[in-house]
């Protein structure tokens, strides 16, 4: 029987999660050209993220950041043999279907781009292509998994070259899982109810607009055709799975601020399953060497002879102090 490679990449939740797990232990690099994609592949990247501008340039330019030009994505896909991912705006259903049609291997519903929907993220179970989503804490991760994310990543603060927010996010997820493991079923139900609340914001606004007060309308079909009871039940099932496994049921990568080999090693030490590097490679003075060095450090993160050697002779991208960025301008604040 001949295997259909497309069916191995796309389709059921199990297949989508399995494809995502194949990148475990590796580095995924942002690229904006076919030449950069070739550099990433030669350096040992397990996948590339095709986009028009790296996060540092998106941050500097301001305005509205959208899906990359499909022609640019196709050029990158034609240039390399490793998987190619692409970013989609939060909640932008049509961008997601366009990228799926192109044949990208995975989508990133990304806060780096300007959100399209003020109420909802994509219902990723309607897509055949796997999707990665960012999370700052366990509730955000659980919501994205409920929606169908096949991979979670920290949000960090993209484009800053500053690792502190990625560290904050993975530590919060780890701590909250540790607490969750000791919870009773009754406590888990309360957590599920709290995590579910963001799916009813639109219905509450409709109630206030129409009835003058919140809470006057039912929660039937509040999100993706599901009402409150089903949403809470499915989220509770995910929480029980996390409690049983002692970790997220999907791979959890680090992203947002990784700028040096030591940054990559740090995130692996803290429990990340792999690392995304956005601006840190092609905003550094020597992208080829930086790319190789980060891959070496991530793959050998507990061998500090290797990490030290990988760090020699490198200069990272210019960094940004997080405290200098107003909270409402921080990309990590996008999403719900």
UniProtKB/Swiss-Prot annotation:
Species name: Thermoplasma acidophilum (strain ATCC 25905 / DSM 1728 / JCM 9062 / NBRC 15155 / AMRC-C165)
Q: Where does D-glyceraldehyde 3-phosphate bind?
A: 171
Q: What is its EC number?
A: 4.3.3.6
Q: Which Gene3D superfamilies match?
A: Aldolase class I
TM ranges are: none
Protein's name in the database: Pyridoxal 5'-phosphate synthase subunit PdxS
Catalysed reaction(s) here are:
aldehydo-D-ribose 5-phosphate + D-glyceraldehyde 3-phosphate + L-glutamine = pyridoxal 5'-phosphate + L-glutamate + phosphate + 3 H2O + H(+)
Read off the CDD domains from this record: pdxS
Binding positions (D-ribose 5-phosphate): 30, 159, 257, 278-279
